[in-house]
Each structure stands twice: as C-alpha cells, then as structure tokens.
Amino acid sequence: VFLFSGVLALIAAPVYGYYYGYGWEHALWFIITFSFCNLSITAGYHRLWAHKAYQAHSSLRFVYAIGGAFALQNSVLHWSSDHRPHHKFVDNNDKDPYSAKRGFWYSHIGWMLRNYTEDTYSDYSNCRDLQKDKIVMWQHKHYLALALITNVGIALLLGVIYGDIVGMLLIVGALRLFLSHHSTFFINSLAHIWGSQPYTTKNTARDNGLLAFFTFGEGYHNFHHIF
C-alpha cells in the first residue's frame, strides 16, 4: 500500500497534472478529505480511544470510525492496541512498538514491515475497554470493506461529479492517502528527533510547531508524552 500510493502520489499525480491540469475542486476536496482523515486519527483514534482523554457522542464516534477507515491506518482496536505500549514503554526497544531509539526509518515505517504472528497480531488484551464499544467493534469487523468503500468510492464519486475520475483518484485517493500516512508517521519518527523538549528530557519526544500545524496539534509531542 505504501509503495503503491507513493508511486501514484509522487509520479503519476504530477505527470497527470502536467498534461491535463487540476482545478479548484481537486484542491478543495484534497483539503477536506485530508483534514477529515487526520482529525479522525488525532481526535478519534488517538485522543478519544487510545488515551480515553474525553467522551464523545455516538454520532461523533461513528464519524471518527469512518474517517479512520478512510485514513487506512487499521481499525480503532488495532491502532490503539499498538499505541498504548508506546506510551507505557516509550523508547524501550523491546517493548515500544515504534521505539525512536531503533532509528528514524524503523520508527517511521519499518516497524509495520516486521514479521507478524497470528497470536500477537490479534492480541487486544490491552484494549478490553474498547471491546465494549459497539462502534469500535463494528468498525473492526467491517474495516476492510469500510476502507475500500471510502478510499475508492469517495474519489470515484467526486470524479463522476466533476468529470475527472482519474484526477480525483490521484489527488483525493493517492496523494491524500500518501500525505495523510506520512504526516502521522512523522509523529512516531521525526517528532522524536527534531524539536524542543520544554517539558521533559526523560524520553525522546519533542515539540515541533511545523509538524503540529500539519497534524492538528500532534506535533506538540514532548507535552503529550509527559502530560
């Protein structure tokens, strides 16, 4: 997925744009869909479910569940199960799933390319609370279908509406997915390398205003890891 979306975003999208051009509608829907995906991860997957930082109405939780599937970062249950050990064992190479001390590329994307075993891949014992959430479990059960419908269906629908299916698939589909993925991944990698540490130096997390802007506040990572 990462390779395919990267090729389409970095090669196919610019080439298509050079020959056929893009309009205001491509830019508008890119911003809307990118924001929807990243907010669903930040406010939904991360703060609401993984950290239980606040409570939300079922309608908002449903919207976040759809947006999270659109972001293509696995289900709420799986994402939260990976993330909770990161905070509990931050920078521990043996227990932190994406420990920054194992290097930039590992914490950015390499940790997702590791060998998986069936028993550990589906072990959600650290998220028993989330298994009581009907929306979380509904999304987990239907994640693949939801991911396919949102990632292909939304771009196709917009393409039909505006008369440019290929252009919308490249911008709202591939480019949006590529940038949404890597802006999130940069929090696991770059936000543990580049930035300031005004709140704690006990771990590698850093505050980075530039990353915070593109990730709806996630770049204030030093603050997040201490509070």
Predicted regions span which residues?
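Non-catalytic, topology-defining segments of multipass membrane proteins
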Residues: 1-185, 190
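Active-site-proximal inter-transmembrane loops
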Residues: 127-135, 194-220, 226-227
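Residues that scaffold the ATP/ADP-binding catalytic core of kinase and kinase-like folds
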Residues: 48, 223-224
